[in-house]
């Protein structure tokens, strides 16, 4: 029998609900801080004298840093625990969002956005790992889908805040609001339990370290390259490439949609203005991204993980070119919501299938590498789309994003089916 989000929460224990809320808040506020840059980009470009290529390059730096941060925080989460690593990542991106508002030069802004990216990358794998290890097998897909859906809420909240703040103040104050997520760490520290699976694994590892060296197991001391060896090697490469092409398509498209909608027509945009753009983005998130993220967990429990990936990614590849050709506000609204549904919904599967492929001793670092490593590789997407858009227009550049989603759907066919698998 299918269950909805409310029934899902009723079936969970209080500790499971708190871990879900912590991961969802972290991911929502990650989106909030990350997307503030896109929402004020047109104003930052004007005041700091940035070209589209330079603006895209700053996005590239942030995504590159997120890959580094994902790997770093993955190792950190395996060493000091999921909860503390989650707290550190949230503090990192919150403080640097505030600092971005103090920037007076492009170089200053680049430094702060780079450090913000480190925290942004670390939050995803630590939160996903915490939920995967806390929730039971039969509810795991739906729980992670709920976490992923919070990105859409964060993006919509960022659009709302930017739309309101920019009416009364400049873009710097939009970044200043980005410090607020730091307050969430106070609650996480007191109210969220550590993953019992990680605690048990650490206790086992400590017991092994008390035994003679000849009898000592290798858990906890395995090389990073274990994820490239049998039986994980093929899955690691396939998941890395799926995430790379998917993230290339997503960041290439959604990092440029806000300026694309708000810039005047003569500058290659749609000329909807800041309030029109904010309204379109809120609708896009609440009626496209949010149900897309949320639905994937339920679809994956019916079709399986692999088929669901192929469905969502292939649909995104079809609808992105149609969105790029849209001219009227109504067409932009409807097609934008459809693209957001499929083009972001598949992300709910990345943490899910990765958690089911890898054992506890490798899980956080493997998720950190396959997702945030891919995010680092895809860091060129905003720069490439900005560069192509400067010469040929952003509409034409968006076709590249559709091609990236298609390649991601092909990579999904190489993944193992993990539906119903118990975590090791």
Task: State where each predicted segment sits.
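Interfacial helix-cap and linker-helix signal at transmembrane-aqueous boundaries
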Residues: 44-45, 76-77, 161-167, 261-262, ...
């Amino acid at each position: 029998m299918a269950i909805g989000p409310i029934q899902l929460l009723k079936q969970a224990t209080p500790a499971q609900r708190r871990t879900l809320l912590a991961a969802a808040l972290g991911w929502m506020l990650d989106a909030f801080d990350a997307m503030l840059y896109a929402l004020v980009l047109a104003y930052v470009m004007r005041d700091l004298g940035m070209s589209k290529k330079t603006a895209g390059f700053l996005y590239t730096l942030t995504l590159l840093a997120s890959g580094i941060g994902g790997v770093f925080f993955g190792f950190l989460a395996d060493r000091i625990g999921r909860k503390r690593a989650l707290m550190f990542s949230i503090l990192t991106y919150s403080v640097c969002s505030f600092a971005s508002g103090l920037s007076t030069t492009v170089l200053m802004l680049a430094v702060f956005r780079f450090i913000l990216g480190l925290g942004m990358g670390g939050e995803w794998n630590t939160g996903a790992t915490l939920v995967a290890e806390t929730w039971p097998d039969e509810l795991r897909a739906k729980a992670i889908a709920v976490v992923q859906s919070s990105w859409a809420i964060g993006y919509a909240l960022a659009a709302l805040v930017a739309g309101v703040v920019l009416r009364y103040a400049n873009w710097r104050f939009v970044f200043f609001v980005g410090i607020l997520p730091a307050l969430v760490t106070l609650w996480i520290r007191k109210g969220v339990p550590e993953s019992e699976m990680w605690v048990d694994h650490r206790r086992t590892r400590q017991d092994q370290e008390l035994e003679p060296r000849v009898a000592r197991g290798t858990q906890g001391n395995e090389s990073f390259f274990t994820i490239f060896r049998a039986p994980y090697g093929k899955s690691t490469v396939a998941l890395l490439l799926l995430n790379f092409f998917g993230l290339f398509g997503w960041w290439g498209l959604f990092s440029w949609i806000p300026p694309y909608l708000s810039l005047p027509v003569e500058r290659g945009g749609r000329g909807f203005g800041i309030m029109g753009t904010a309204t379109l983005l809120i609708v896009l998130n609440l009626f496209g991204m949010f149900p897309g993220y949320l639905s994937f967990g339920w679809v994956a429990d019916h079709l399986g993980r692999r088929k669901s990936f192929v469905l969502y990614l292939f649909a995104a590849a079809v609808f992105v070119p149609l969105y790029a050709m849209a001219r009227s506000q109504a067409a932009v609204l409807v097609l934008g919501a459809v693209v957001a549904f499929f083009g972001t919904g598949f992300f709910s599967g990345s943490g899910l299938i990765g958690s089911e492929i890898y054992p506890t001793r490798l899980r956080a670092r493997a998720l950190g590498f396959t997702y945030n490593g891919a995010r680092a590789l895809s860091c060129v997407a905003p720069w490439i789309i900005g560069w192509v858009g400067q010469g040929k227009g952003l509409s034409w550049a968006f076709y590249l994003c559709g091609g990236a989603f298609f390649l991601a759907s092909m990579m999904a066919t190489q993944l193992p089916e993990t539906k119903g698998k118990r975590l090791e």
